[in-house]
Amino acid sequence: LIRKGHERTVDLDQFYTADGIMPHAMESHELLKEIIIPLNNAQSAYKRLAYRSAIDYPIVCAGVLLRPSDAQKIQIDEARIVVGAMGRAPLFLAQASSSLKGKNLDDTGAFQKAADASMDSAATFAVHNVGSTLEYRCDMVHLMVFRALKAAAEAVQNSNG
């Protein structure tokens, strides 16, 4: 973030505040200069569900980052699961994310459990802000997280890094 005569760096987990009045740490006189994403062999995937995919606010969305533990790309060293359109800000799901550490990249059972945990966690923070039921949106969190996990795992396995 920059402003006249000053520049500062804010970690992403500190940038979003979950405050409806001040939803992020950027102040009115600051500009976003750059976003730095250190990948280190990690791959990501994003899935969203909307009534009309090109123009609508999503009913629910999920973003996943998976970093393999070694060059063989067998196990997960780090996972980050974030869901959007459920709360007042994107929700980083720490418990669901950490449950994948050490799991194999082809372990769909572990992905199902992480998707279950994601659904439960997101339901806690859910707000009624779109034209669908809360139950449906929670079910879709599970589906979007599971699909994003599978897509990110496939991207890791197919990457050249």
Model-predicted regions and their roles:
Residues 1-161:
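C-terminal structural segment of proteins
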